[in-house]
């Protein structure tokens, strides 16, 4: 969908009018683009829970939309700098636009200045016993959806006989 009028209102910072324009889409079919626009309007109007609902809906539609992770980071920045930083990290992971990457990186660096910031790598442990194909899918999914610098992967084999390791 185009959402041309809604985009124009957002660019003009006409938030109340954008909220009214958004009303015509609220009961229709959603996509991640509409979720980004709606979350932007809700957050500009100070309705952070409404923004969160739109972001969650958009991520269900497309979990690779970096703009939704950026908005989610903005939502969490008021509550938990670690969650915000992780959202910005996901935004960077999925973003290919260099200008947007710089902006996201600035958000990430700003959050890191918070004294409460403390994010460590995650250890993902996979216990295996045969089921080579399932294990490969699991590992592939982790590699497709997680920044390689954010985790370590530990595979523990329980004497597989199908060539799993």
What are these regions (language model features)?
Residues 29-30, 63, 96:
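Short coil turns that delineate tetratricopeptide repeat
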Residues 24-25, 57-58, 90-91:
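Canonical positions in the second alpha-helix
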Residues 12, 45, 78-79:
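Structural motif corresponding to the intra-repeat A-B loop/turn of tetratricopeptide repeats
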Residues 85-144:
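N-proximal low-complexity "stem/linker" segments adjacent to membrane-targeting elements
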Residues 157-165:
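A conserved acidic beta->alpha catalytic loop
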Residues 34-35, 68, 100-104:
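TPR alpha-solenoid repeat register
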Residues 7, 40, 74-77:
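Residue-level recognition of tetratricopeptide repeat
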